[in-house]
Regions:
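Long, contiguous binding/interaction regions
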Residues: 1-45, 49-163
Length: 163
């Protein structure tokens, strides 16, 4: 099962390396990883997406909690949450394809951010499933390049990850 783990950690050199090292040493795969400073400049929020059975995820969270740099963490998938990902995608679009690509982009509420005579660059945000569906709708033969930010997530309601 896919899990999104949100980690509040010290904003110090080497902190990210220790978290990634833990995953690597234990043979856990990281599907996506985002990290940025929080409202408190001494802390960073790391959001890691990984796949595993509940027992494996429990083991990961226990090991993460043992790291000196980790202040607090939560598995967002245990409750209601909001997740978003940004994707930039270059799509071949010539002749009649241009209108079809634009229509598909509109259906998925994407934005065309760059246009050349032979292609569109589209920006799309949403849950990973939405981005995957857009890629499938466009078709692999039309895709020139894809860049994705990785998942960012936050708990719904009044639940807050803070010190």
């Amino acid at each position: 099962m896919r899990h999104i783990i949100s980690v509040l950690m010290e904003n110090e050199p080497g902190a990210l390396s220790r978290v990634v090292g833990l995953f690597s040493q234990r043979g856990y795969n990281i599907e996506s990883l985002t990290v940025a400073p929080t409202e408190d400049p001494t802390l960073s929020r790391l959001t890691v997406t990984t796949i595993g059975e509940d027992e494996v995820i429990e083991q990961i969270t226990k090991q993460l909690n043992k790291l000196i740099d980790v202040v607090k963490l939560v598995d967002l998938t245990e409750g209601e949450h909001i997740e978003r990902e940004l994707m930039l995608i270059k799509i071949k679009a010539t002749g009649a394809q241009r209108a079809e690509v634009k229509r598909t982009c509109d259906i998925f509420r994407g934005q065309v951010v760059d246009v050349t005579p032979a292609m569109y660059t589209v920006q799309l945000t949403g849950a990973s499933d939405k981005l995957d569906a857009f890629i499938e709708a466009i078709g692999a033969s039309a895709i020139l390049e894809v860049v994705r930010s990785g998942v960012s997530g936050i708990a719904r309601g009044e639940r807050v990850l803070s010190v």
